[in-house]
């Protein structure tokens, strides 16, 4: 194609070297149109990709959309299906890494799944717990358990269990394995639990605007609901079990504590959760990132500033 373009350029230069007439200009326009159409045809059609039998050794041709969907939800993998809920706002670089990585990881383990990116699009401070509540309510009847999963934490050990946690909540990113947080009551990062158990806790508190502390409150909810917490065993990779891709220098977390939030952060919210969650789904978008399907749920949270004035920074 590039050789053809050079020939066309030489023809055009020679063509213009003589006397310029309206017919020559018309002919030149036609040549340019034909060259443009040829370029468009080659760049937009599948002709520029390798045939199926000419892909490099070990590399399969791209999967079709139907293939991608079936690869995420193969009924032969078992009766349970995971809703991987990712609370999200503006971390697009991390998302581009996370979705293909997790889709491949779960496929390898034959975990039926769908990835839900709950994207906060309102003007309030980030509320991770409320977004996870939204993810639970919007996950559909085809899923029966949840993964509360941070977008910046990637599992590196194939022995980590993402299966159905029938006996109780399963903390994948346990304090013995998480690269940053090592206190005993930590339940953040990646936590699996059945929807039944999540409803028993009334979800997570909606009072935690800004970064942090919602996991500690949820730990107390698990205890109150009488649920036993399980963690991985036999994992020998220690703090190298996960790859933490958050760049603190580039994306600073909102850790400000304002008004009475400093006192509220250590209290248990006895009534809040799924039952008093207020939100609007602005739109749902089915996306494919490097061959991995996911659903983006653009969500506007609502805040009663009389109850939690710290949902905004003044």
Describe the role of every protein-language-model region.
Residues 18, 123, 129, 136, ...:
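Conserved catalytic core of nucleotide-sugar-dependent glycosyltransferases
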Residues 83-91:
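A conserved hydrophobic helix/loop-capping motif in glycosyltransferases and polysaccharide synthases
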Residues 80-83, 114, 217:
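Cell-envelope/extracellular polymer assembly enzymes that use nucleotide-activated donors
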Residues 90-93, 153-155:
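Short acidic, S/G/P-rich loop/turn micro-motifs used as interaction or catalytic elements
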Residues 2-46, 50-58, 207-210, 216-314:
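C-terminal catalytic/acceptor-binding lobe
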Residues 70-78:
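Short boundary motifs at domain starts and secondary-structure transition points
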Residues 92, 96-100, 107-143, 175-179:
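Active-site-proximal specificity loops/subdomain of glycosyltransferases
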Residues 33-37, 64-69, 97-100:
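Eukaryotic beta-rich interaction modules
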């Amino acid at each position: 194609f590039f050789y053809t373009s050079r020939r066309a350029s030489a023809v055009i230069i020679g063509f213009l070297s003589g006397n310029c007439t309206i017919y020559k200009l018309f002919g030149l326009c036609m040549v340019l149109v034909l060259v443009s159409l040829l370029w468009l045809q080659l760049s937009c059609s599948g002709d520029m990709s390798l045939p199926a039998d000419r892909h490099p050794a070990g590399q399969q041709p791209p999967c079709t959309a139907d293939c991608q969907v079936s690869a995420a939800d193969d009924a032969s993998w078992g009766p349970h299906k995971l809703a991987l809920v990712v609370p999200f706002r503006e971390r697009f670089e991390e998302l581009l890494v996370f979705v293909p990585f997790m889709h491949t990881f779960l496929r390898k383990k034959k975990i039926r799944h769908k990835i839900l990116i709950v994207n906060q699009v309102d003007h309030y401070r980030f509320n991770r717990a409320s977004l996870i509540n939204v993810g639970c309510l919007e996950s559909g009847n085809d899923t029966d358990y949840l993964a509360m999963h941070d977008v910046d934490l990637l599992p590196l050990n194939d022995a980590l269990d993402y299966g159905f946690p029938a006996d109780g909540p399963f903390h994948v990113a346990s304090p013995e394995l998480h690269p940053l947080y090592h206190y005993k009551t930590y339940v953040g990062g990646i936590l699996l639990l059945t929807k039944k158990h999540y409803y028993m806790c009334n979800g997570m508190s909606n009072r935690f605007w800004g970064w942090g502390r919602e996991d500690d409150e949820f730990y107390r909810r698990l205890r109150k609901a009488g649920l036993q917490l399980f963690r991985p065993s036999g994992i020998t990779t220690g703090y190298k079990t996960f790859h933490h891709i958050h760049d603190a220098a580039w994306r600073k977390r909102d850790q400000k504590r304002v008004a009475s939030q400093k006192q509220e952060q250590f209290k248990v919210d006895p009534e809040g959760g799924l039952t008093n969650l207020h939100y609007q789904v602005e739109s749902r978008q089915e996306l494919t990132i490097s061959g991995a399907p996911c659903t983006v749920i653009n969500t506007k949270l609502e805040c009663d500033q009389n109850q939690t004035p710290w949902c905004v920074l003044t």
